Amino acid sequence: MIRTFIARQSFALWGLGLILGSIPCFSQSVEVESGTLDGGAGIQNCESCSGQQMVGNLGTGSVIVPVQVTNAGTYRMTLSYATGDQRTINVTPNQQAFVPITCPASGGWSTVATIDLRVTLQAGNNLISFDNPYGYGPNVDKFELSPLPTPLVQIIPFGINSRIEYDLANGTYDVYFTNTKVVAEASARAHSNAVYRSNAGYTSRTYTSAPVTDRFGTGTRHVITLSGGSQLEMQQVFYTYPSRDEFYTEVLLNGPGSNCYQMSPLTSNAVDIQSNADHRALFVPFDNDKWVRYEAKEHRYANFTSSEVGTLYDNTSRKGLIVGSVEHEVWKTGINLAGEGRTQTSYVSVLAGWTNENVTRDKRGHGWVSVGQQSCRSPRILVNYANDWRQGLEVYGQANAIAEPRYVFNWTQATPMGWNSWGAIQSDLNLTKAKQVVDFFANEVPVFRNADQTLYVDLDSYWDNLTPGGMTGDFSQLTEFANYCKSKGLKPGIYWAPFVDWGKFNRTMEGSSYNYQDCWTKVNGQPLDLDGAYALDPTHPGTKARIAYLINKFKASGFEMIKIDFLAHASLEADSFYEPGVYTGMQAYKVGMEYLIDQLDGSMLVYAAISPNIATGRYVHMRRIACDAYKGISETAYTLNSTTYGWWQNQMYSFIDADHVVFANESEGENRARLASALVTGTLITGDDYASDGVWKTRSQELLQNSDLLQIINDGKAFRPVEGNTGWDPNALFVKSMGNSHYVAVFNYGAEAKSFTIDLARVGLNAQQANQMKDLFSGSNLPSNTTAGSITLNVPAADVRLIQLRESALPVTLVNVEAKKVNRTTRLNWKTTAEVNNREFIIERSLDAKAFKPIGTVAGAGSSTKSIAYQFTDTTPTLNQTNYYRLKQVDLDQTFAYSKTLAVRFADQDSLTLFPNPTHGPLTVKVPRTLVGELRLEITKNDGTPVLVKKYTSVADRSIQINVAPLNVGVYTLSLEDTEGNRRQARLIRN
C-alpha cells in the first residue's frame, strides 16, 4: 500500500531519502585518458573534450581505467564519447560480464555526446575496461559515476502475464512479455532547443492512469509525468488493451518552446529476444524506389536504421520483437537497430524525426513539429513480442490500418487483374496498339478474367502520345480508348505522377495561373531533383489546381482506374511549404494525397507505384511491393525479396502487387516463375506487347487461362514466407491457405536444377494429414507422401513448382480436362486415373462464367483404378459469344466437386461489336466478316417495334457509323442482316 501510494504521487528524487532509502548526493568524473592503454589504443587531441583529449582506436585496442567508490552497488555511468558513425563500446567492470553500449553518431569525431548505462561496482578499487573486440569503437572522453537511486517500480500490466515495470526513481522501464524480460532500461527523449531525457535531470515523476476508448478498443492510458530540474515537462504514455498482447507508447513535451525535430518514446541498449540460434535484424525500406531491397541481416553485423518498423527475431524459433510507428501523418520514423559488437543483446532506438538521403530520399533534416504550439507529441509506437515474427509483423500491419483508417473508399470488388503498357510497349504507345491489346484480351484469352469477369487495361507513361497538345490538348483518343475497353467488357486505366515536374523549366502550370517554379519543392533555395524530376510542393495551390484539372480530364474520358507514381516526391522535407502549419514532409504528403483522393471522388481503383511503403496505406487500394521489374529470373528474385519481407503490408492495402509480369522471349521456366511471383504476392498485372506477334502470346494463352492458377488470387492475399534468413535475397519457399486447400510455391533462382525437401510442420501444415497433391502448372496429380511429414520437389533451373495440397483426397482424380470448338459444336474430353464411388459427371455451361446450367450427363465408372477417357459434345453452344464449361463430379452419396472452368469462343469471325456502348450520340458498328453484300441495319425496342432501319450497299473498313441521339434512353436490339439471310444481333444501350 505504501508503494502504491508513493507511485501515484509526485515525489522529489532527492527529498524522499527516508522513504526511498539513503541516496548519496555525489558523483565523480573520470578522464578515460588517465587509464592504461593497450593494443594500439591511443590518446587523441579533442578541443571540445574535457582536458582537450580523448582515447581512440578502441576497436583493436583497449583502455583500463581505475575507479574507487565507497559503497558497493549499481551506479549510473554517463559516458562522453565522439564518433562520426554509430559504434559500440564494451564496458567491463572488474573483468565481469561486459556491458555493450551502442553509441549513436555524435555529429563528428570532435563533437562530444553522452549516453547512460548501468555498471555494478565493488566497494573500494575497481578496474573498468573499454574496448570492442568485435568491431570498431567510438572515441571515449570521460565518464561520470553516480549511485543509482533505489528503484521505485510502477507495474503496468498488459496482455497475458506481460507487464511494463517503470522505475519512477530513475526514469527507465523494463518490459516483460509472458514473464520474460525482453526490453531493459528503456528511456525516452525529446530533441528541441535542448535535449530532454526521461532518465536525467528531472526531479519529479508521477504516475496516473485513466480508461481510454479509441480505435484499438477499450483499455487504459497510463501516463508518467516528469517535471522539475528547470526542464520542460515530459510525459511518457503507455496504452494497454485487455484483448491485445502488444502495447503502444508515445512521448510528449509540454510547455512554451516544446516543438521538436526528433523524439524517441523508446531507446534501450539492453534488448534481449531470449533466442539466438539464427538471430536476425530486418531492414525495411521507406519506399520502393531505386530497386531498394529489404534485408534480414545477421544480428552480429546489424547496424542500421529501418523505416517505420524494426524487427529482431530468431529465424529458428521464430520468436521476435517488433517495434514500429503506427502513425505517419506528421513524422518520418526510423527504428535504429544494432547488434554489431554484441553477442546477445541489441540496441533499439525509435527515432521519430529521421531522414536519410539513401533511404527516405531527403536532402535535409526532418522538419520541426508543433511549431508555435504548447505541446509536441511523438507518433504512437507499437511494441510486440511474438512467438512467430511473421505473425507479429501482420499484427503491426493491422495496427497501422486501425490507427490510420483508409481515406480512400473501401474496395468491395474483385481482386484487380489486367495489363499495363509500361511492361513492354512503353514509349511506343498509341491508340492503334492500345486497341489491339484490348482485342487480344477480349478475343484470345477469354478465361483470363477476375471474379468480376473483367480486366483493367492501363495506359502508363506516354499516354500523352494519344493527346496531341499534351495535358491541355485533345483528349478524344483517350476517350475513344476508354469506350473501346468498355465495349469489350474491360475497364480502362490511366497513369500519372501528380507531384513531379519532368520538364524542369519555368512555365505556366496546367489548370492554373501559377508558374512551375512557384511550386517546386526547394532545399537550400534550390529545386529538389529526384529520379530526374523536380518535386512539387503538394500543399501549393498551383499543384492542387493542376491535380484537379487533369483528374477531371481523366474522369471525363471515362477511366475507371488510375496508377499514381513517384509519390515519395510529395513526402520530402523542404525549406518550407506553402500551406501554413505544415513543417514536415509527412504533413505535406497528407495534404497532397488527401486532395488527390478528394478529386478522384470514389470514381476509380487507385493503384500506387513508387511510394512510401506504409504511409500510403490510407490513400490507395493497391500498391506495388517493388518497382520496375519485368521478365527474367533475376527480376523475379528482386520482386520476391520485397514479398518475402514485406508481405504483411497486405494488412494495410486491399492488394499488393509484384510489378509487371512480362513473358517476352524468356524460357518457359522463367515465364512460370514470373507469373508465380505475382500469384504469391496476391494480384496479377501483365505487361507484354500484345499488339505484336511473338511467343509471349502463345504463352499467355496457356498460362493466363489456367483457372487453377487464377483462383489462387481470388482473396487478393499474399503468401507467407517460410524462412526469414535470406539476407537481401528472396525466400525460395512460400505458403498460403484458402479453405481446405494449401498452396506451396518453391522457386529456384539458380542456374542449376535443385531438389527441395519441405518440412510440412515448418511450413505450417499438419504433417500427419494425408493430402492430395496437384502441380498447378502441369495440372497433374502427384503421388502423396505427406503423411511422412515432408515432401520432396525437384525444381528445374530458373523455374518454380506451385503445388496445391488438399486436406482430404478427392474421390475422383481428373486429368487432361479440355474443351475445344469443332465446327459449330464444343467437344469436351477428360480422363480419370482413379475413381471411388463415382456416380456421374454433369456438364455445365455458362455465358458469364458465373451462372452455370446443366446441359448433359455422362455416367461415371463407380470405382476404378484404371485410366478412363470420357467425352461429351455440346451441339448447341451459343454462337457469337464465349461459352464457359465445367464438370460437376457427383459421388454415390451426392457429394460433388467441380473441375476447372474452360472457355470456348465462337465470336472470332461472327461477333457484332458496338462501341461506345452505352452511348448517347455517335455509334460505330463493326461488321462481322461473315456478313457480305448489301446490309440491312435495324434497331428495335424490346417488344420488337423497329425505331430505325437503314440499308448499306457497301461499307468502308467494315464499319458503320450512325447517330442514336434521337432515340429515347433505354435498351434496344441492333440487328445486321446480309442478302443471304445471315443475321447478327447485339444489345444497344442508349444513355
Each predicted region: which residue ranges?
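C-terminal beta-strand-rich structural cap/linker in extracellular carbohydrate-active enzymes
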Residues: I128, N785-A809, G970
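Glycan-recognition surfaces
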Residues: M509-P541, A545, Q587, V591-V695
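Short, surface-exposed loop/turn motifs with a glycine/proline- and acidic-biased composition
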Residues: A859-Y884, T953-E980
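Carbohydrate-recognition beta-sandwich/jelly-roll modules
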Residues: I155-A451, M561
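Carbohydrate-binding surface patches
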Residues: V67, Y75, S80-Y81, F247, ...
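C-terminal tail/sorting-segment detector
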Residues: L892-D908, V949, V969-N991
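Short, compositionally biased serine/threonine- and acidic-rich segments at solvent-exposed termini, linkers
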Residues: E807-D910, V932
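Extracytoplasmic
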Residues: Q28-L152, T792, L805
